[in-house]
C-alpha cells in the first residue's frame, strides 16, 4: 500500500462527495481489500454503483471478493500482459486463487481490457486466452474483443456512443489482416495481426498500401 487506509478513505470520500468516478491503481489482494473497506465506510453500494468505480489492474482480486466487488459496481480494467509473471508470482497467484478473470465475468463484474505495455492488443489477446498464471481463467476470443471494445466504453460512461458498430455510434473500425476470432488461428499467431484499414470518426486514418 502506498497510502494508509485513512488516506484511501479520505480520497474516496472526496471523490464520492463530488460524484466523480474514482480510478484506483490497485495491485495485490490486501490493497483491494483496503479499497473495498474504505468504500463501504464512505457510502452505500447503491450509491457507488452509479459512479462505476474503476479498479485499474486489480490482479489481486480474489475469488471470494468477486461478490463484494460486484455489489459496489466495480469496473475491472485489466491488462492481460500482467498475466505473464515471474514463476514466484505465478505460484502465489495460483495458491491464493487471484486473477479470477473468467470468474469475474461469470460473477457479473464489468470487465474492460487495455494493453498498457506492450501496446499490441493482439499480443494481449493471446495472453488473455492462454494466461500462464491462471490457465483455468482463460477467456474466449469473443470475450476479449468485447472487453476491449464495449467493456472499455462502459468503463468511461461512453457505451451509448462507442464500443460497437451500430447506427448513431462513432464510425471507429479496423479491417484486420486475419480473423482473430477464428479458433483455427493459433494463439501464437495473434500478435502478428495488423490493420489493413483503420477508420476513426468515419475518416480513414491508415490504409495499408497493398489494401
Tell what function each PLM region has.
Residues 71-73:
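Structural alpha-helical segments in enzyme catalytic/regulatory domains
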Residues 1-10, 58:
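Active-site gating/metal-coordination segments in enzymes
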Residues 13-24, 30-53, 57-58, 63-67, ...:
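His/Asp/Glu-enriched, well-ordered alpha-helical/loop segment
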Residues 4, 184-189:
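Residues that cap or delimit alpha-helices
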Residues 210-211:
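Residue-level structural signal for beta-strand termini and adjacent loop
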Amino acid at each position: 500500500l502506498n497510502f494508509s487506509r485513512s488516506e484511501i478513505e479520505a480520497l474516496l470520500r472526496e471523490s464520492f462527495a463530488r460524484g466523480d468516478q474514482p480510478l484506483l491503481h490497485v495491485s495485490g489482494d490486501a490493497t483491494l481489500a483496503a479499497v473495498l473497506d474504505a468504500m463501504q465506510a464512505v457510502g452505500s453500494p447503491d450509491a457507488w454503483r452509479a459512479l462505476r468505480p474503476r479498479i485499474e489492474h486489480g490482479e489481486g482480486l480474489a475469488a471470494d471478493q468477486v461478490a463484494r466487488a460486484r455489489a459496489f459496481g466495480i469496473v475491472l480494467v485489466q491488462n492481460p500482459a500482467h498475466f505473464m509473471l515471474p514463476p514466484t508470482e505465478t505460484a502465489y497467484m495460483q495458491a491464493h486463487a487471484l486473477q479470477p478473470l473468467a470468474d469475474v465475468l461469470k460473477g457479473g463484474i464489468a470487465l474492460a481490457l487495455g494493453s498498457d505495455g506492450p501496446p499490441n492488443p493482439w499480443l494481449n489477446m493471446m495472453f488473455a486466452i492462454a494466461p500462464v498464471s491462471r490457465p483455468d481463467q482463460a477467456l474466449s476470443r469473443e470475450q476479449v474483443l468485447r472487453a476491449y471494445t464495449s467493456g472499455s466504453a462502459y468503463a468511461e460512461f461512453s457505451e451509448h456512443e462507442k464500443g460497437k458498430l451500430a447506427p448513431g455510434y462513432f464510425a471507429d473500425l479496423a479491417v484486420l489482416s486475419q480473423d482473430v476470432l477464428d479458433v483455427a488461428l493459433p494463439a501464437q499467431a495473434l500478435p502478428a495481426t495488423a490493420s489493413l484499414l483503420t477508420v476513426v470518426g468515419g475518416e480513414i486514418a491508415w490504409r495499408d498500401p497493398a489494401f
